[in-house]
């Protein structure tokens, strides 16, 4: 059971981190004031393997309609993905990914909706940025130098995901032996240095809680890890950049109420000072964040 005493002890040990401020910048034409107003990233999946059925769109027209609906419901950015991160999902080649992504990216760009593309492929990255994507959601670091050069050339933002492996589809066991934050801080510090050296100015950091490590298949182990990282995320803000989190679903616990899972985890992520919430449930997360803002400013 999570207690007030545990939260007080956590903040007491890391008071400087709790007061840290992060970089604020524009994505597309939209200014993001992360230190005062957390933002929402709505998900549109272009892969039939994605299990969250409400977010799956198998045609460009349906994807554009869903993206515009999410923007109207409160999404600040739309995140597109053409390959599922599920461990048993089929691999999707670069050509197939770009054929699915580009019509949607172009349509949303024309509608002035900031677009993110989730990928670890340099070829998909190049095509997406040239088509008008404003954010690259980088789920692998094997080709990070090339990706950072492309991001900088387009004055785009990059979400650097923590991955223990070449990319999200090639992960093994997660190191659960100790506090994960120092390990993540070291990883992000190296990636930030590399990104900045190649000209990237707009950076967000994602601890990668939605990735399918082999030793996190047990539901209780996975949820305990996710909650611990959510609550400790504010410690990563000392690196100077906003924190992005993909909200989990915890189907084994929520079962037929699975659409309530992301709002539950959003509260914990907000307590850890998350700056960008990646979600399939935009209106529910918007309601949670607006309510927490009222409490914060009361």
Locate the predicted segments by residue.
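A short, N-terminal amphipathic alpha-helix
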Residues: 65-77, 81, 107-108
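N-terminal amphipathic alpha-helix/helix-capping segment at the start of soluble metabolic enzymes
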Residues: 1-48, 196, 290, 296-298
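Active-site-adjacent loop and "lid" segments of alpha/beta metabolic enzymes
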Residues: 52-61, 65, 69, 85-103, ...
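Glycine/serine-rich anion-binding loops at beta->alpha junctions
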Residues: 48-57, 73-84, 203, 209
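A generic "binding-loop/recognition-motif" signal
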Residues: 47, 120-121
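Short helix-capping segments at alpha-helix termini
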Residues: 108-113, 197-200, 238-239
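Active-site loop-to-helix "anion-binding N-cap" substructures in soluble metabolic enzymes
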Residues: 25, 70, 77, 119, ...
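Structural preference for beta-strand elements that scaffold enzyme active sites
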Residues: 39-43, 76-79, 114-116, 134-135, ...
